């Protein structure tokens, strides 16, 4: 049952700041990577000094590159929501990563060595890399832009002019170049007429900023730090492995006689799914001395490099325990007909469940206003739900 919405602007908060970072205007042309004029720049005052929890090193990065940091924060925000989606049927469902204006890394579970900790580290690192690289390709960042260029701009323009002239005469004029990253992007078919062009996602810049922002520059001195840096690396590796080739057709009457192609990161949902698969096969690391951080893997280093690792057995997460980053499962909605992990039997840890008529208030009909807030209506939704005792 849907009641009439009541207009009420929510506070800006971290989410509003993040929307300001990346969704403040219509997307620029992804092919050309246009930098449209007229958008006020993000400054240190609007980004760095409004968010608590930045380390000294992160604050320095933010002061030097507030626009890139804003994109990184957006990436963390997206990563937390994707983490919640991927683990929505688990007892621990990433809700503890929502920091209320602080970075997710202040959550207690990220100071532990659980499988869930490993998954969270990889997801957050991937989110920063993905968001920064995407912002680069959209021309939103001062310090970076399009990624790899297959040829000089003059050569590219000359080639395009020759090709368009050939197309206007009803002929094809193939120009093809190899992928800049062998193995990371599918190769064109023999009948394809295409060239690398447009605006590639600058994955190198995104990876470097993710590493600088999240990894400590000092050598890791304990097992927890080594686990964090390793899983950060796995998250970024998954983004690189899932690069896609996107193309735009050119030609008369939509004939697609010629395609301009560029590298792009996939939707973040695909990144989340790939990391969720790695979570299911995460590797437990035995250690001689946790203070020394010495790994005692049972697998070859090459096999270990692309997998999530952890060194603590996870608790059952049934009860609330702030020291473990566990919110517990009391009050969680469950599926009484399911025998899977989202079923009331598993999710409620044997405590049983109640059937409640619940009215919740949710944000709806959101509009972004420049500058600088998101204005939403509040809608009331009434429904019957099964809730863990």
From Swiss-Prot:
InterPro entries: Wnt, Wnt10, Wnt_C, Wnt_CS. A lipid is attached at residue 253 (O-palmitoleoyl serine). It holds the Pfam family wnt. One of its GO terms (biological process) is cell population proliferation. Gene3D superfamilies: 3.30.2460.20. One of its GO terms (molecular function) is signaling receptor binding. The modification Phosphothreonine is found at residue 46. One of its GO terms (cellular component) is extracellular region. Palmitoleoylation is required for efficient binding to frizzled receptors. Depalmitoleoylation leads to Wnt signaling pathway inhibition. The keyword Disulfide bond applies. Residues 1-28 form the signal peptide. The keyword NADP does not apply. Expressed in embryos and in the mammary gland of non-pregnant mice. It is found in: Secreted, Extracellular space, Extracellular matrix; Secreted. Keywords: Developmental protein, Disulfide bond, Extracellular matrix, Glycoprotein, Lipoprotein, Phosphoprotein, Secreted, Signal, Wnt signaling pathway. Glycans are attached at residues 93, 335. Disulfide bonds join 83-94, 136-144, 146-199, 247-261, 249-256, 318-349, 334-344, 348-388, 364-379, 366-376, 371-372. Belongs to the Wnt family. Member of the Wnt ligand gene family that encodes for secreted proteins, which activate the Wnt signaling cascade. Specifically activates canonical Wnt/beta-catenin signaling and thus triggers beta-catenin/LEF/TCF-mediated transcriptional programs. Involved in signaling networks controlling stemness, pluripotency and cell fate decisions. Acts in the immune system, mammary gland, adipose tissue, bone and skin. Forms a soluble 1:1 complex with AFM; this prevents oligomerization and is required for prolonged biological activity. The complex with AFM may represent the physiological form in body fluids. This is Protein Wnt-10b. It comes from Mus musculus (Mouse).
């Amino acid at each position: 049952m849907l009641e009439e919405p009541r207009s009420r602007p929510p506070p800006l908060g971290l989410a509003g700041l993040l929307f300001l970072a990346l969704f403040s205007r219509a997307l620029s042309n992804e092919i050309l990577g246009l930098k449209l004029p007229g958008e006020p720049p993000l400054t240190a005052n609007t980004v760095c000094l409004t968010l608590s929890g930045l380390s000294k090193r992160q604050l320095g990065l933010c002061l030097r590159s507030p626009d890139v940091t804003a994109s990184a924060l957006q990436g963390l925000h997206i990563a937390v929501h994707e983490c919640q989606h991927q683990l929505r049927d688990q007892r621990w469902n990433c809700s503890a990563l929502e920091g209320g204006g602080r970075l997710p890394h202040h959550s207690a579970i990220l100071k532990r060595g659980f499988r869930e900790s490993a998954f969270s580290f990889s997801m957050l690192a991937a989110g920063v890399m993905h968001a920064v690289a995407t912002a680069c390709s959209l021309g939103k960042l001062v310090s970076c832009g399009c990624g790899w260029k297959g040829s000089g701009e003059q050569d590219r323009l000359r080639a395009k002019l020759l090709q368009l002239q050939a197309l206007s005469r009803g002929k094809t004029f193939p120009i093809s170049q190899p992928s800049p990253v062998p193995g990371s992007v599918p190769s064109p078919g023999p009948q394809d007429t295409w060239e690398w062009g447009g605006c590639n996602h600058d994955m190198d810049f995104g990876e470097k900023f993710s590493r600088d922002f999240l990894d400590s520059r000092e050598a890791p001195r304990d097992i927890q730090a080594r686990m964090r840096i390793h899983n950060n690396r796995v998250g970024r590796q998954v983004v690189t492995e899932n690069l896609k080739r996107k193309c735009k057709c050119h030609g008369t009457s939509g004939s697609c006689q010629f395609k301009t192609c560029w590298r792009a990161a996939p939707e973040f949902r695909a990144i989340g799914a790939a990391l969720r698969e790695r979570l299911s096969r995460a590797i437990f690391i035995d250690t001689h001395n946790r203070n020394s951080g010495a790994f005692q893997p049972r697998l070859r280093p090459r096999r270990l490099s692309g997998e999530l690792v952890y060194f603590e057995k996870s608790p059952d997460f049934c009860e609330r325990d702030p020291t473990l980053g566990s919110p517990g499962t009391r009050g969680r909605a469950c599926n009484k007909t399911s025998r899977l992990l989202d079923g009331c039997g598993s999710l409620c840890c044997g405590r049983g469940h109640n059937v409640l008529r619940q009215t919740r208030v949710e944000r709806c009909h959101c509009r972004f206003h420049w500058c600088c807030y998101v204005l939403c209506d509040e809608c009331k939704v009434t429904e019957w739900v099964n809730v863990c005792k």
